[in-house]
Amino acid sequence: MLEAYRKHVAERAAEGVVPRPLNAEQVAGLVELLKNPPQGEEEFILDLLENRIPPGVNEAAYVKAGFLTAVTKGEVESPVVSRAKAAELLGTMQGGYNIESLVSLLDDAELAPIAVKALSHTLLMFDAFYDVEEKAQAGNASAQQVLQSWADAEWFTAKDKVAEKITVKVFKVTGETNTDDLSPAPDAWSRPDIPVHAKAMLKMEREGITPDEQGSVGPIKQIEELQKDGIPLAYVGDVVGTGSSRKSATNSVLWFMGEDIPYVPNKRTGGVCLGGKIAPIFYNTMEDSGALPIELNVQDMNMGDVIDIFPYEGVVRKDGAEISSFELGKVLLDEVRAGGRIPLIIGRGLTSRARTSLGLEETDLFAKPIDPSASDKGYTLAQKMVGKACGVEGVRAGQYCEPKMTTVGSQDTTGPMTRDELKDLACLGFSADLVMQSFCHTSAYPKPVDVNTHHTLPDFIMNRAGVSLRPGDGVIHSWLNRMLLPDTVGTGGDSHTRFPLGISFPAGSGLVAFAAATGVMPLDMPESILVRFKGEMQPGITLRDLVHAIPYYGIKQGLLTVEKAGKINEFSGRVLEIEGVEHLSVEQAFELSDASAERSAAGCTVKLSQESIEEYLNSNITMLKWMIAEGYGDVRTIERRIKAMQEWLANPELLTADSDAEYAHVIEIDLAEIDQPILCAPNDPDDARLLSDVQGTEIQEVFIGSCMTNIGHFRAAGKMLEEFNGSLNTRLWVAPPTKMDKDQLTEEGYYGIFGRAGVRIETPGCSLCMGNQARVADKSTVMSTSTRNFPNRLGNGANVYLASAELSAVGAILGRIPTKEEYLEFAQKIDATAADTYRYLNFHKMGQYTEKADTVIFQEPA
């Protein structure tokens, strides 16, 4: 075992990274060595046991806990690990497989004091709390000590307060840093391996940043040079963390700028991030990881500056002179002290339970968020939805709450990290009502590591009562949306988890794991911006044009700027609430809610008609029954969701915003004013332009796909290509969002049309959108229906215009962005058959689905 391990250490050292944590097989070998250690290796193998095995309910932790428990019981002997040492090491494992053993040691006269100390600082107790409480009530003095320690929050007070002054050196990245810069999509395969993945951070050259190897390895030498004097680095940028909800982006920053977590291999906490604007999901993920994120003016901070941050005073000084000021939320410094927002929440809950058990009043030890001032105004739709999930009428902007998570989504490039986080949380079963896992980002062109994920992650999810899709099924959102319940709240490990029914607050994998495991999520209720559409859509104008009208009108009203220095984005961190499109189908509404991600909004609501929602739920009940017939699981979870949908349909009620609800801003968009398509220019989804401003630009590649598309878009493109009846000079990629779309398009003959036109047809899923597998040619100019067009996302040096499927199809045919007149000529023909083109997948009216759905008999009768 040691020989193989040392070989692995040498191989990793050659790559410039630390070794992987030990797996279960290696720990089993280590256990045998610990029983009979080779001479001279005692210290080394003890260090492996202590520091190189992941905590929680990891398979390796199971073997470790089993060995240590056996030693404490005297069933196994080791010259290296005494009974006392074994008990001490059980106390470093955070939770999960060590808990039962530690609780039982409270009855062991010799080891009880060690168990008391260990349990006093263990937060992941869950139902084992009652075992300790029971012992305490039965007179066990050690258990009473533990209960009192929890009540006194010694797990928190034993940690150092955040320092009055924090000295850091500036690592300045000018302009916008998106999560693709910090965690590049082509390197998604390595995300769970934090030290390896971190090497790709900022691997593309940009102002002030010099990668070790352009396109492969980031500025590690530059970082190491700055760190030579021992002053910790702080990540500083004008705009930081926009884009995808990748916890891997935070992991990479903290790998270079954070600090080790005792007894936890290859993971770091702490660190400081300063940004003129910090995207809300990234900010939350930093909070969860124990970092200190601060929004403030960074224009007087330059690469290599040594600055002093005074967190309690709210100022930053350089050479004694004040260069910036800020205001922190009251709870943030408690979060940093506790090692993150999630440990703080779990710890506060544990302290509260202990105090209740002991008959003590609520503690005043923790900082409390400031409650917003009382208001006699009404609530917005989002405030009512979150209120319902908290058991109250509504939640005011600025109010802290923990809404119930009805639906949680996970996809395959964040899923392996979410799995690790769930293990760290000692989660063996989900508390959220429905948790769904997809395989949409990696199924088309999987690497061996992806294939392993495809084989292992479904069982992990279903064993915890989650629902697992299969590789090739399609995009997470196109499936998850069909599992939603009206007016409920959820989250997902993908920034485009933007429910068209209810509301969702997407998050990084750590917070998603917490939501899935506990069934709730921490939330500081954001303010809302109302977007109200009025009037009639003009001929040729699509929903994608309405999507782009929001930033276009935002720019016109001074609520949004494209310039990154001193960036204005009033949408950032707020909820987008959309009205005036009640007639849309839920599939169509998702196009609007989905794109709230590009605004860096915290969430989105869309006011829809009861008729649209009823049709959607009837369709989805059939789809979910069909899934059971097709062998999907967890069956009980799917059945429970079907019954909840049926209950809503039996008594349909929808929340509505109050007429006197308060909004941070109101944007009114007259559809009569939008008489030509609106695109987003390279390479910024905020840079909304009219078609006439960009017409004539030559196009080499076109992509029609992503969660922003539905079956109607592919019919529209197919009809244009059939009318064209020639060979394209552009490269056109087509990727339907689900296998159901693919099957229906095939049945209707559209795949034949695509084939004759030379279209590259992709597996249902994300395809080019994330850029983690297939990519467009370097430096090509592209029209795309994808979600965002950040630099290098779809291809290295590519210039990407975001546009509707209809406009993109015209671009593919012409080889350039058309004029308004050219486009409308094509669009007129599509409008003539709109009723046929824009039919959606109503499964309850499709025989191939109803026939199978009708065979399903529920395991548990209603």
Stretch-by-stretch model annotation:
Residues 2-31, 36, 332-336, 341-346:
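Amphipathic alpha-helical packing elements
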Residues 5, 27, 41-42, 64, ...:
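Short amphipathic alpha-helical segments that mediate assembly, nucleic-acid/protein binding
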Residues 15-21, 43-59, 73, 80-95, ...:
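Structural detector for internal amphipathic alpha-helices that build alpha-solenoid repeat scaffolds
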Residues 24-25, 58-64:
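Helix-turn-helix repeat elements of alpha-solenoid scaffolds
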Residues 30, 45, 63-72, 99-103, ...:
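Buried hydrophobic core positions in alpha-solenoid tandem helical repeats
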Residues 31-48:
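Generic amphipathic, hydrophobic interface segment in small proteins and small subunits
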Residues 34-38, 71-78, 90, 103-110, ...:
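Alpha-solenoid helical repeat architecture
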Residues 92, 98, 105-107, 113-862:
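Fe-S-dependent hydro-lyases/dehydratases of central metabolism
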